Amino acid sequence: MGLAQQCARPMVVHNKIIEKELEAVEGTQYVTKESILRRAQEIKGIPLRDVDKTGRLATGKGAIGTVIEESWFGYTPNSESEPDFSEAGVELKVTPYLRGKNGIRAKERLVCNIINYMEEYDKTFQTSAFWHKCNTMLLMSYEHLADKPKGDFRIDEAILFSFPDEDLAIIEHDWKTIMEKVRAGRAHELSEGDTLYLAACTKGANASSVRQQPFSELPAKQRAYSLKSSYMTQILNKYIFGNAESPRIIKSADVLHTKTFEEYISEKVKPYYGMTQNELKLRLGVDSNAKSLNEILLARMLDVKGRIACTEEFQKAGIIPKTIRVQSNGKIKESMSFPTFDFIALSKEETWEESELYNYLAPTKFMFVIFQERGDGAYVFDRVMFWNIPNDDLEEVHRVWERTVQTIRRGVQLIQTPRGISNDLPKQTESPVAHVRPHGQDASDKLPLPDGRMMTKQCFWLNNTYIAEQIKEVR
């Protein structure tokens, strides 16, 4: 590197210059959006160990954000209702991302502020604590590298972010959905999967962190407003990395002033109810037999090319389409599978709410594409249904997860039988909601157990009988 290049970004190279910069901002107030953004962009590329003046990096979760607040901007972090830069109305949020074979994705949800059930229910969206604190955010991103110490991490971009109109309409609906449960005395039933972009995630030292709610004597889990990791993934890709936009279902935010996103989808596909898959292909001009055919058909119904799962709204909300074929007797043949799990990684998961299964299932809204069997044996498009797992049922999945983890830690029993090898992982007969079994037919596709033995890949499933009941309940 030549001298001119070295001098172009002296803060990255010379620690003394960095220290001088840090001293200069001690006690400084940033009162305009422009000055805040300018200061934020000056940190880009600097190892965080060279920023940290207080030793915060040695502490737990949230340390990186605290380091930037204290050591870079020179103010004491607060967890109050005001934005971090109250004069400018800007909230500072540091968001990590992961780089993988499928591109960039957010490492986690973006937690905003604690929901005070006793106060928030009496507000409008525009006067809510969420909107007051987070309507404009300074988003600072960094790549999380599992094999590197935090001191090596570097902020790579900083932007001022305000919600685009098309997102804001959905976020306002999400806020209203959360408040409807609080006003109905059901804050204890809140779930991340209730909503699309803005969620009420659990927030506390442990599962016993609870708060009073206004219309019920039952304590409710402490929760915070948060932006789902699926939403943050799209924000990072669009606004930080400038990646190409995905096709949108909602062409104008005005559409969502009178109906919810789910209502809009249901209305658009209703004219196609009662048609077989082949009839839909002819009607919509689709010449495909791909595994994702039903997703393609739904996208066409909504005037979108490609798969519905690849639309901007479905990606932001993390909505997963699932085709369900209901037999004429009301039964469903197939249970609903989740991704296969790694036995060793699963055995090391310490808490349910930090587990891979919880963070897949709890915040996810599914769109069931339901085909009903007619008397002649043909299956016709019956309806779409947006669904997320109720809290009580999520607790039953928790129990199945707990027993699975304990069984793997103790040592799975593999028993040779005339029909093959059986095991003592939770079976469908043991729970009304979930079970564990192999995902595919290939018994030779195996992964190592913690004790070194090899075992056919397994995954969690929601029981077919459970899904049938969930569909039946809302008809």
Where are these regions (language model features)?
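Nucleic-acid endonuclease domains
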Residues: 2-475
